[in-house]
Regions:
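C-terminal "capping" alpha-helix adjacent to the active site of nucleotide-linked donor transferases
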Residues: 331-332, 340-357
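Donor-nucleotide binding loops and adjacent catalytic segments primarily
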Residues: 203, 210-290, 323
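A donor-sugar binding/catalytic signature common to diverse glycosyltransferases
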Residues: 283-324
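Short acidic-hydrophobic, aromatic-tinged amphipathic segments that line or gate anion-handling sites
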Residues: 277-278, 335-341
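Conserved N-terminal ligand/cofactor-binding loop architecture of enzyme catalytic domains
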Residues: 32-113
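C-terminal amphipathic helix plus adjacent low-complexity
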Residues: 356-402
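Acidic anion/phosphate-binding donor-loop and adjacent secondary structure
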Residues: 187, 194-209
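Active-site and donor-binding regions of nucleotide-sugar-utilizing enzymes
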Residues: 29, 85-182, 187
């Protein structure tokens, strides 16, 4: 770390944010931490580096499209791989070492990005960038302090690297898991998953039977519009409830066209009104106004929902990280699973018809929410900056245990 960064105070920090754009959550987490640092006056400069933009085209295409095809057509295989690879890095040798070397070669242009030479802190919100940067840190190729922000409830071993100066995880349970995976307890903090600071300012609008306000159901199609959204919406339009259903289609133009066609065909006096949005940057307002959210159990979207105390109906979790997220949320009492799309409407109707149940779910979501996680991470980045770089001895220990 540059000496002037310490002498000049926290406001002189240059921070590089690294991720890989597979889905929207990883990038949203980077932006949330950036905005919190900026709000606290800790940024002198910021650079966002998208790893796949600095990789060969064949690799970037395979990485993005291959994963999306796999979760769509072979989710059980994805889950099996997730479970079998959730072991400490030292237990993945020698195959793991070969894959590490291949990854370093493929991402050579990313590793050589000029932004790293002047950075005081590097923040990684994707496990691939964490692995590459962690190895750079251990070799002495990265002088900046390295912070990993895990964007899932469960810190799978691919997120855990002893080259990191700080690993931020979702909860105390996640911290225990990270420590069991070989991370120094002094280098892992239970901060929560960072979300847009706007969620700190969003107050939920409570629904109670007997009020004139029509309850609102938010259907989140996700940044890619994945999932059986059309079936879910039709199940709610056919359900015995009075509600406004707002479906967010993300960047899926085909889904948006289909939803608008359904909405235009609805009679004006239908008990369930359908409203359609494409990609939106006001999810914090929509979630605060909603009474129930229906969507996939992604780490960022469910964290945002909990920040405003929004009960969730979770659609067919993908085996692996989504399954872990869903189990945690259902266990808290903040969510219900809908493993079949056609059941979503009856589940939502049942929640809205039972005010006591709805209130319990809202309270459970709110109690487990950490809307200020991004600010907590910013505080820890500031403390890390004041402490300076890890000692040579620390780096040697990290190299031995990786």
């Amino acid at each position: 770390m540059r000496s002037d960064a310490l002498e000049g105070g926290l406001s002189s920090l240059n921070v590089v944010f690294c991720s890989a754009s597979v889905g929207c959550g990883h990038t949203r987490a980077s932006v949330a931490v950036h905005d919190a640092l900026r709000a606290r006056g800790q940024l002198a400069g910021a650079t966002f580096v998208e790893a796949l933009e600095h990789a060969p085209g064949w690799f970037a295409g395979f990485y993005r499209d291959g994963y999306l095809r796999a979760i769509r057509h072979a989710p059980r295989v994805v889950g099996a791989i997730y479970d079998r690879t959730d072991v400490p890095r030292r237990d993945r040798r020698p195959l793991g070492s070969m894959l590490d070397r291949s990854e370093d070669r493929i991402l050579r242009r990313f590793r050589e990005h000029l932004a790293f030479t002047s950075a005081d802190v590097v923040v990684s919100t994707h496990f691939m960038t964490t692995a590459v940067l962690g190895r750079m840190r251990q070799r002495g190729d990265l002088r900046a302090s390295l912070v990993t922000v895990v964007t899932d409830e469960h810190p799978h071993s691919v997120w855990l690297h002893r080259g990191c100066d700080l690993t931020c995880v979702a909860s105390a349970a996640a911290r225990t898991t990270a420590i069991a995976g070989g991370i120094d307890p002094a280098r892992v903090e239970a901060t929560g998953i960072p979300i847009d600071p706007k969620f700190c300012m969003s107050s939920p609008v409570p629904f109670a039977t007997g009020e004139s306000r029509t309850p609102m159901v938010l259907v989140a199609g996700g940044g890619h519009g994945l999932g059986e959204v059309e079936q879910v919406v039709r199940s709610m339009l056919d359900s015995p409830m009075r509600a406004i259903v707002v479906v967010v289609c993300g960047k899926n133009a085909e889904l948006e066209r289909a939803m608008r066609a359904i909405a235009e065909a609805r009679p004006a006096d239908a008990p369930v009104e359908l409203r359609v949005l494409g990609y939106t940057n006001v999810m914090h307002e929509l979630m605060a106004a909603a009474d129930v959210m229906v969507g996939k159990p992604g780490g960022l979207s469910t964290t945002e929902a909990r920040a405003v105390g929004l009960p969730m109906v979770l659609l067919r979790p993908i085996p692996g990280q989504e399954e872990r997220n869903a189990d945690m949320l259902v266990g808290l009492g903040a969510a219900v699973r809908a493993d079949r799309a056609r059941d979503a409407g009856s589940i939502v109707a049942g929640i809205l018809a039972d005010p006591a149940r709805h209130w319990r779910m809202r309270a459970a979501a709110s109690a487990s929410g950490r809307p200020r996680a991004a600010f907590d991470i910013a505080t820890r980045i500031g403390a890390l900056a004041r402490a300076g770089n890890a000692s040579d001895g620390d780096r040697i220990l990290g190299r031995i245990g990786a």
